[in-house]
Amino acid sequence: CYDDWGDFEHVKRVDTGLLGAELTTDQASGKYKISKIYAGENWNESRRSPLTEQGVNVKEGDYLIAINGTELNGSMNPYELLENTVGKTAELTVNSKPETSGAKTYTIRPIASELELLNLNWVMERRKMVDKLSGGKIGYIYVPNTSTDGNRELYRGMYEYNEKDALIIDDRYNGGGFIPDVMTNLLERKTLSYWQRNGLSAMKTPGIAHNGPKVMLTNGYSSSGGDAFPYYFRKKGLGTIIGTRTWGGLVGMSGNAGLVDGGYISVPQFGIYDENEQWIIEGVGVSPDIEVVDRPEQLAKGIDPCIEKAVEVLLKQLQDNPVKKVNAPAPPDRSKWNEQMK
């Protein structure tokens, strides 16, 4: 399955601090310009965006004049000045003009990786895309894995899009995990009853449930639990699968003992089969109901073919079978209850 080294010396890495932003060189002034600042979730350390934290008034389009007092020009690499700043603070001097006069200096905390911010940006772009294409009727939930993060994002999305007519569940690039069945059960929930509290909006039981149509997106990087998730989704009849065939890897390993030198060798230990006593998914994957290939040249232009097809399919389903909106009835005349019970 997998192996890893033991008592080998590891090269000590030099951590370079990152800003959660894109820098471009302004040819006219020879200064660096902050062309994009990635939005973050600053309560979550893995998604913290340094330039959006409280007290840091840096905007897209500002010029990065200096780092830790060293003035920058276009021939310098700004990240050299951010070496060994992870877990520490750094001073950024910025200005709306490419000059030092009127510049302001902010103390920020650089981050070690921008991967989560880039992923969050990708997700937010698709949320906006779905909202625009569907006229606000469809919600979009990206599920990065079938473990802690994926379960959290699914719950958050189900809360946020509780009132949407339809849902897109994006399983593309899903890294797997051990709870795809739990997540599928959440998608399967239907509303059992409604509650009207005086003066407030109606509530429902269960609090997280969605009654409308759903689509799941897959690709060749939907792996392990990301294979099982669409398989269970289809088996429960929850909706249409769109995209390309999944990775096809559900022979697994767990609990392998380590070796004496600190390394390990993991051995395949279990595989998946169905009620017909047939081995499934491994080496084959889960094929979509509608095949759509995400062409690189289209993605580079900001086009997401799977998203567009999913919206098209769901809007057609909503047109053919509109979701019934359940409204609270008029308040009951409780004086007549005794008569009604006779």
Can you annotate each of these PLM segments?
Residues T24, T93-K97, Y273:
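A generic structural motif
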Residues V94, E282, A300-K301, P305-E308, ...:
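Conserved functional hotspot residues or short segments at active or partner-binding sites
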Residues A21-N44, V58:
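Active-site-adjacent "gating/activation" loops or surface patches in catalytic cores
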Residues E291-Q298:
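C-terminal or mid-to-C-terminal helical accessory/interaction module adjacent to the motor/catalytic core
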